[in-house]
């Protein structure tokens, strides 16, 4: 707003018409995976493949990043991602939120916000999509989230405070990708985030090319339980992010300096851990652990796979079995048997060769 904030950014304006994607990182200055991914995206995306415009802001909260101040504003101690849409006459973070929501977001047709766990948080990679907006915006946000190579996605149920939440309330399909944490970053995490962004751009037709490979198709996680510590203490988690949990299971404990038990974290229902505090200390009313319920909806991909095989053969089962028992499969079966440990009593369940792929289903004891 009025030139108060100078943000490192790149604008890729293609020669062909199309939509505009806004990509931001560094809303929290200590979340480095997204920042490095944004930097590399600005260098590696080819402008001749862009249809429309891609705006990449590499660091939003520059003062906090440059002073290693974590998630909080340098002068006001506020969390920028709780201040949207902001206030032009407010504190530093309120003014920055106002500048982003009134200068950057209105230019966008779609929005991706890149995050990590805080410098004290461990997490399993997942994605939020905006859930408090009109039906079309929510649907488009979800389709964007479905392109992300993470195991889980969460529908957000707030419409303001966060940058992507507010953007969606203004009709801009928006998601927030979580990957990495603990004030660190790796090249693999950065590559994965770059790949996610590129796949979304290809899906939307803003970037020309084929979508890259992926490992996951995210499952919905609902009813998120954010457990905060009731008092300061030493935190001893018994689980890791991504672990499955059962109702009534003890997830961790808070103790004092003498080892006295202050508090237990107990699972309220079956689910999966999304993130937890990774440092020894926890603060009263501060985050301890977050988990949610995994939803297993009908998966139409199974039908698509069956349909594919049915088109290849009038008799699906006969055709499939012929491929599974091809001469090449038999040769591989002999080679694999040589590698199995003799003392484990393992047996191979199946081995198969298909068009363009080779699959092995093994090893069961007994």
Locations of regions flagged by a protein language model:
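Conserved SAM-binding loop of SAM-dependent methyltransferases across substrates and taxa
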Residues: 355-365
